[in-house]
A protein has these predicted regions:
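An N-terminal structural lobe/cap that precedes and organizes the functional/catalytic core
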Residues: 1-100
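Charge-dense polyanion-binding interfaces
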Residues: 86-121
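An amphipathic alpha-helical core segment
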Residues: 108-158
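Single conserved hydrophobic/aromatic residue that forms the stacking wall/gate
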Residues: 169-179
């Protein structure tokens, strides 16, 4: 969560996160659909461990990613309201555009675009709330999710964070206070 505007938020992802977070956001949205609209069942991992799974009653079941870390703060935040989901979908859409701009190809997660555009049927209606900071405690700023994520980038991610030359990017007035 690097900017309140979903397009600018996508733009502000460093190169490594443009690649990595597209997958994680698709997993979050897939998990929201499965947890909210699916039927719980138990499966077994290859090692025999019992796994919680959710089966969707329609073709999404064979298309969407499996549910992951359903109690992770980001997953809980996403399922709290339709506006949280819509914000993440918009940011993810723009992040996919960012990926194409920076790397000259389409990310494989784009195959999920039309299946994730709709909110889960059973998601509560509500206002957007800033994402819950999912980071070490020392980076969290009470009541300031945006500031927390900027601090996290500065203190914990600065060693690898770099941005491709973005001088021609379509967004005006980029803000990267953590550089």
């Amino acid at each position: 969560y690097l900017h309140k505007d979903p397009q600018k938020c996508a733009y502000e992802h460093c190169d490594k996160h443009v690649v990595k977070m597209i997958i994680e956001y698709a997993q979050l949205m897939s998990t929201a659909h499965r947890v909210l609209d699916g039927e719980l069942f138990f499966d077994k991992a290859k090692n025999g461990r019992k796994l919680r799974r959710f089966r969707l009653p329609d073709d999404r079941d064979s298309i969407l990613m499996l549910s992951v870390h359903e109690n992770h703060p980001s997953n809980i935040w996403l399922r709290q309201s339709d506006e949280n989901y819509k914000w993440l979908w918009q940011m993810w859409f723009h992040l996919n555009r960012e990926y194409t701009y920076r790397y000259g190809k389409t990310h494989s997660c784009m195959r999920l675009l039309m299946n994730l555009i709709h909110t889960p049927k059973n998601i509560p209606t509500g206002k957007f709330t800033p994402p819950t900071p999912a980071m070490p405690e020392e980076c969290k700023i009470a009541g300031d999710s945006l500031g927390s994520y900027h601090k996290y980038y500065i203190e914990k991610k600065n060693y690898f964070a770099k941005w491709t030359d973005l001088s021609l990017i379509h967004i005006s007035e980029p803000t990267r206070p953590y550089l």
